[in-house]
């Protein structure tokens, strides 16, 4: 991972579909395809009446096309999901065998586009739009007692999606290394449905929608050219919580 000194506060979950990347497309200036693989650790706060911390680990593959000033890309990947204290009881009469919701790898897809305008040979500015959707539900269950009676219940996290729009400033330094930083806007929603409405548990009043707590964040990263068309990208994002990711791309 590139040293974190270049990663300033960026978003907590806006990277739900992976890195935003540098404002300038990674494809060759004359135009062409690129492919890549990436990993991201994502953490953010969602809320309805109360706050809920969500964590994800993602791996994905990417294919895109671009020229010097614009590019489009798509990603397909898998992600786990953890909601802290999703089963933690808030009443003495209810106890649960576990606190956190956890589920393993589910498929998601991402589409994005970007435009770039060079101000001079060193600096440039760009904008991007990126959206992700999770094709499968996350589920987990717990058991416990309520007023001495045994119960089992399951939570289902459905239709998780996010949309991000941001503006980035890029500086090209020696060895064609690109440093970039900027703000972004972010919107994410998901529905959570319990199989049983159990008093004392956080999600106990039927199906609800939760959304990201903060709609604005910042991101910062570095793009390092490697040998023979390969690039290494590392990025940090922050709004309510910190997220980080890295990717390797190849330009044809």
Where would I find each of the regions flagged by the language model?
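Short glycine/proline- and aromatic-enriched beta-strand/turn motifs that initiate or cap beta-hairpins
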Residues: 11-72, 79-82
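Residues that define the transmembrane beta-barrel architecture of outer-membrane proteins
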Residues: 29-33, 53-59, 68, 103-109, ...
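Transmembrane beta-strands of outer-membrane beta-barrel proteins
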Residues: 33-37, 70-74, 109, 125-129, ...
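Outer-membrane beta-barrel pore domains and translocons
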Residues: 38-42, 75-81, 116, 130-134, ...
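Outer-membrane beta-barrel proteins
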Residues: 44-48, 72, 81-87, 136-142, ...
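Extracellular loop and loop/strand-boundary signature of outer-membrane beta-barrel proteins
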Residues: 45-51, 91-102, 149-156, 203-208, ...
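Outer-membrane beta-barrel transmembrane domain signature
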Residues: 64, 69, 117-123, 130-230, ...
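Outer-membrane beta-barrel "beta-signal"
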Residues: 224-225, 240-252
């Amino acid at each position: 991972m590139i040293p974190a000194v270049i990663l300033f506060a960026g978003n907590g979950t806006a990277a739900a579909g992976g890195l935003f990347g540098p404002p300038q497309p990674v494809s060759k200036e004359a135009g062409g395809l690129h492919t890549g693989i990436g990993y991201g650790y994502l953490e953010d706060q969602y809320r309805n009446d109360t706050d809920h911390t969500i964590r994800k680990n993602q791996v994905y593959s990417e294919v895109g096309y671009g020229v010097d000033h614009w590019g489009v890309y798509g990603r397909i990947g898998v992600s786990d999901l953890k909601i802290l204290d999703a089963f933690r009881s808030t009443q003495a009469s209810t106890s649960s065998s576990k606190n956190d919701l956890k589920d393993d790898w589910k498929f998601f897809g991402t589409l994005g586009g970007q435009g770039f305008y060079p101000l001079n040979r060193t600096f440039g500015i760009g904008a991007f739009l990126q959206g992700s959707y999770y094709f499968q539900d996350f589920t987990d269950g717990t058991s416990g007692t309520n007023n001495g009676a045994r119960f089992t219940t399951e939570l289902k996290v459905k239709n998780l999606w996010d949309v991000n729009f941001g503006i980035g400033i890029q500086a090209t330094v020696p060895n064609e290394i690109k440093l970039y930083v900027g703000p972004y806007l972010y919107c994410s929603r998901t529905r959570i449905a319990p199989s049983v409405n159990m008093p004392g548990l956080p999600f106990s009043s039927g199906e609800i929608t939760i959304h990201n707590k903060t709609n604005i964040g910042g991101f910062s990263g570095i793009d390092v050219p490697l040998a023979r068309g390969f690039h290494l990208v590392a990025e940090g994002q922050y709004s309510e919580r910190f997220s980080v990711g890295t990717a390797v791309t190849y330009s044809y």
